[in-house]
C-alpha cells in the first residue's frame, strides 16, 4: 500500500496548532520536554559551550538506542556533569563524548558505529570549535552548523539524527538567546513517535509506522505544511510530537487522546490542549 497524504486532515491539524503562539510552544518545551530540561540544566551547571557541543555530538549517535530517549538523555546528563568540567577544548569534549558512548548501556546497539560517526563529525573542527567558543552560532547561523556536519559525514541529504543534533544542542543555548526559536528550514526528523502521530492524526495513510519511518517523505510534506500554515517552526512541532507521540502506539485511541490532552495541559491552556489532542489522535498507530 502506497502512502497518501490527506490534505484536508493536514489543514485541520494546522488549524489546531495555529491556536498556539510560539511562546506557548517554547514554554511547553521548557516545562514538559525532559530533553530540554536536562540539556539546559547541564548548560547552567558547566557552561553553554561545552553542553551544546557535547549534546551536538551525542545527538549524532542518538539512533537505535537500547533504552527510551528520556533515559538516554538522563544518562548523558549524569555522565557529562562529572566529565565535562575537566574537559579542555574540542579534543577534551570529544573524549568525554566517547566516554559516554562507551559506558552508557543505551549505546550498546552498534556502539562502534556510533563512535565512528562522532569521530567523522569531528573533522568539522572549525565549526565545532565555534560552537564551543560561541554557542550562540546555533541560534544565529544554525544552517551553517548543519551543513558543516552534513559535509563532514558525507551525507547527500540530512539524516534525521543530524537535524536532531542541531536541535538538541540549541536547547543548551536558548536561555542565552532570549528564547529565540530554531527556524531551520528542514524536513521534520521522522522517528517512531512522529510516524505514529502522522498516522494517528489521519494526515498520512500508511500500513504501519515502520513504513513511515522507512519512507518519511509523505509525513515530511504533511508536517511541513502544518508548520507553514500554523507559523510554528517544524522542529518545535517535533517537540510536541516527541513528548506525546508514544500514546497512539501504546493506548487505545480514547485513552491516548486523554493522555495527550493531559500532557499538553501541563503547560498549555486546557481548551487548546484538548483541541490539539483531538486532532492528533483519531485512530490507532499500527506497527505492522
UniProtKB/Swiss-Prot annotation:
Region called Helix-hairpin-helix, residue ranges: 134-203
Single biological process term from Gene Ontology: base-excision repair
Gene Ontology MF terms in the entry: class I DNA-(apurinic or apyrimidinic site) endonuclease activity; oxidized base lesion DNA N-glycosylase activity
Positions contributing to 8-oxoguanine binding: 35, 62, 73, 164, 189, 238, 242
Swiss-Prot/TrEMBL keywords: DNA damage, DNA excision, DNA repair, Hydrolase, Lyase
Annotated InterPro entries: AGOG, AGOG-like, DNA_glycosylase, HhH_base_excis_C
Catalytic residues (positions): 160 (schiff-base intermediate with dna), 191
EC number assigned by the record: 3.2.2.-, 4.2.99.18
SUPFAM superfamilies xrefs: DNA-glycosylase
Catalysed reaction equations from the record: 2'-deoxyribonucleotide-(2'-deoxyribose 5'-phosphate)-2'-deoxyribonucleotide-DNA = a 3'-end 2'-deoxyribonucleotide-(2,3-dehydro-2,3-deoxyribose 5'-phosphate)-DNA + a 5'-end 5'-phospho-2'-deoxyribonucleoside-DNA + H(+)
Function description: DNA repair enzyme that is part of the base excision repair (BER) pathway; protects from oxidative damage by removing the major product of DNA oxidation, 8-oxoguanine (GO), from single- and double-stranded DNA substrates.
Domain remarks in the Swiss-Prot or TrEMBL record: Contains two alpha-helical subdomains, with the 8-oxoguanine binding site located in a cleft at their interface. Contains a helix-hairpin-helix (HhH) structural motif and a Gly/Pro-rich sequence followed by a conserved Asp (HhH-GPD motif).
Family: Belongs to the archaeal N-glycosylase/DNA lyase (AGOG) family.
This protein's name: N-glycosylase/DNA lyase
Species: Aeropyrum pernix (strain ATCC 700893 / DSM 11879 / JCM 9820 / NBRC 100138 / K1)
